[in-house]
From Swiss-Prot:
Signal peptide from the UniProt entry: 1-23
Gene: ACE
Glycosylation site positions: 61, 96, 303, 428, 535, 573
Protein name listed in UniProt: Angiotensin-converting enzyme
EC number: 3.4.15.1
Residues that, per the record, bind chloride 2: 218, 515
Single biological process term from Gene Ontology: proteolysis
UniProt organism field: Theromyzon tessulatum (Duck leech)
Subcellular compartments: Secreted, Extracellular space
Length: 616
């Protein structure tokens, strides 16, 4: 679930529209500006390619040598970026241009992010970012209970496998606590220094703090309120789902004294961060006598490999009439974890900005999770492929959430029983209302369970950036948010010696996270519009757009524009509305929302519940 494939370009380039560099001193025509942009795009593409290639080499082989090259190339890019922004402001009164597209391109070129820092500060910031990412990517947990081998376990696949499959409470607690001790606990001082530098760059560029800068990418003064309104719209559904899951877990683990406030122990939900709950679907199936929707067993039975998962994903996108993966993709992607070196395993999609080199990096395991992840990452590549002919400044999603939503479009179709059966991966599905409920529950455990987590991470970071959450309160505020929004609590006592936010990749890697919350809302708007284009006659949750060239045409039109058009207009072109809305999501899940068992009232109110006993 990660479009931002490397840290330095994420640091360098935002999507904001604010320029703070020198006022123009020489008046040139818009014709001159277009000629200047031609040269700029050629030069920028080369610098970005070099920085991206160096960062790829480091991510796929975590050595000090590769890190040194990567920092050097990112510094070169930062210098180029700053120089060109200054030049653009000196040569052109671009804010007075009459061509809105030309003005938009210049506004992006002159909004340079952390490239505005001094060379010394930029190098310090780059080094801190690399240090934080390396701590995360090389962390291992040792001393597993009842394991005399002395083996140390990395997150992927080992600790993730334990959290997702084990029923042993001692083992689950060991993995949960051990991961946080090995990763986040080593980060807070470095992270605090990193935050100060990010804020310094934001201030130079005219923003109140780095959170203000990140929010500017959505080009809306009401963005924060809009997100809160969306959360309030879907919160009752999440509360119902949470209460149902809690009741089931209480039955499974009677030896645990669940807190009276109504929270769930975070290590019992089948995911290291409790961000999705599909791994405990077997406990939660509305019709438990029917077969599981999990296709892992079938994938293994049919001898699927990582490569075969990628080929199947490529076939799905080709069936829509979209662009197939180019040959360099197959030659250069890292689709399995190497045995001979440390790498950043977190799945990511990469655009090398030369219109021909696009790659995925992930440590694939043959199971349903990676089946879905592969389609997600390839969705990012499709977006790259479709906007590759845009100018450099427009080679991004209409807003950051669009990229993640497009990446998830495939998942809403390939998860359907119809698609699974069409590729012979779900031979025993029962097509009746109970089977439907099982399917929707599985989808909700993946997508609805994620929503508060997708919302809370940047709520926490924005408060860190603004100073509302100072260093001595990092961990207590983190658990305040997790308690308030997710309704989970830690299985062991936490303190300010811990830094549990750092146990999630996107925090040390400095990848903004609110995009995933936005994406998990608007992907259902996209899906509904594409299903209409495909003349779908089934309920929205059973719509499968595979093989629909009309749906593919609509999707391609959206992707081709990149960020050249303000996102509300792009949304309106596809859906008929320029507003983000949860109505399509609620329509998708209506049979599950109306299911009587899930609608049992809950006795507790954990939203905002006390958590003082969990933090010392």
């Amino acid at each position: 679930m990660n479009l931002i494939n490397f840290s330095y370009l994420n640091l360098l380039f935002g999507a904001g529209l604010f320029s703070v560099l020198e006022s123009a001193t020489i008046l040139n025509t818009e014709s001159d500006a277009k000629k200047w942009l031609t040269t700029y795009n050629d030069e920028a593409g080369k610098y970005i390619y070099d920085a991206t290639e160096a960062e790829w080499n480091y991510n796929t082989n975590l050595t000090d040598h590769n890190l040194g090259i990567s920092i050097k190339k990112s510094n070169d890019l930062a210098t180029f970026t700053e120089q060109k922004a200054i030049e653009a402001n000196k040569k052109f009164v671009w804010k007075n241009f009459t061509d809105p597209l030309l003005k938009r391109e210049f506004s992006k070129i002159t909004d340079i992010g952390t490239a505005s820092l001094s060379d010394e500060d930029f190098q310090k910031m780059s080094g801190l970012n690399s240090d934080l990412t390396k701590i995360y990517s090389t962390a291992k947990v040792c001393n597993k209970p009842n394991d005399p081998s002395g083996k140390c376990y990395p997150l992927d696949p080992d600790l993730s496998d334990i959290i997702s499959k084990s029923n042993d409470l001692e083992e689950l607690t060991w993995a949960w606590k051990g991961w946080r001790d090995a990763s986040g606990k080593h980060m807070p001082d470095k992270y605090d220094e990193f935050v100060q530098l990010l804020n310094k760059a934001a201030n130079i560029n005219g923003y109140e703090d780095n959170g203000d800068y990140w929010r500017s990418w959505y080009e809306s003064p009401t963005f924060r309120k809009d997100c809160e309104d969306l959360w309030q719209e879907i919160k009752p559904f999440y509360e119902q789902l949470h209460a149902y899951v809690r009741r089931k877990l209480q039955k499974k683990y009677p030896q645990i004294a669940f807190p009276k406030e109504g929270h769930i122990p975070a290590h019992l939900l089948g995911n290291m961060w409790a961000q999705s709950w599909e791994n405990i679907e077997y406990l939660l199936r509305p019709a438990p006598d029917l077969p599981s929707m999990d296709i892992t067993e079938e994938l293994v039975k049919q001898n699927y490999t990582a490569l075969k998962l990628f080929q199947l994903s490529d076939t799905f996108f080709k069936s829509l009439g979209l662009i197939q993966m180019p040959q360099p993709f197959w030659e250069k992607s890292m689709i399995e974890k190497p045995a001979d070196r440390d790498v950043v395993c977190h799945a990511s999609a990469w655009d090398f900005y030369n219109r021909k080199d696009f790659r995925i990096k992930q440590c694939t395991v043959v199971d349903m999770h990676w089946f879905m992840t592969t389609h997600h990452e390839m969705g990012h590549i499709e977006y790259y492929l479709h906007y590759k002919d845009q100018p450099i400044s427009f080679r991004s999603g209409a807003n950051p959430g669009f990229h993640e939503a497009i990446a998830d479009i495939a998942s809403l179709s390939v998860a359907t029983p119809e698609y699974m059966q069409s590729v012979s991966l779900l031979p025993n599905f029962t097509d009746d209302p109970n089977g439907d409920l099982n399917f929707l529950m599985n989808q909700a455990l993946t997508k609805v369970a994620f929503l508060p987590f997708g919302y809370l991470i940047d709520q926490w970071r924005w408060d860190v950036f603004s100073g509302d959450t100072p260093r001595p309160k990092y961990n207590s505020k983190w658990w305040h948010n997790r308690c308030k929004y997710q309704g989970v609590y830690p299985p062991v006592i936490r303190s300010e010696q811990d830094f549990d936010a750092g146990s999630k990749f996107h925090v040390p890697n400095n990848t903004p996270y609110i995009r995933y919350f936005v994406a998990h809302i608007i992907q259902f708007q996209f899906h509904e519009a594409l299903c209409k284009a495909a003349n779908n006659s089934r309920p929205l949750h059973r719509c499968n757009i595979a093989n629909s060239k009309e749906a593919g045409k609509k999707l391609a039109e959206l992707m081709k524009s990149g960020s050249s058009i303000p996102w509300p207009k792009v949304l309106e072109n596809l859906t008929g509305s320029e507003k983000m809305s949860a109505k399509s999501l609620m329509a998708y899940y209506k049979p599950l929302i109306d299911w009587p068992e899930k609608r049992k009232p809950r006795a507790e109110n954990w939203m905002g519940g006390k958590m003082s006993s969990w933090i010392v």
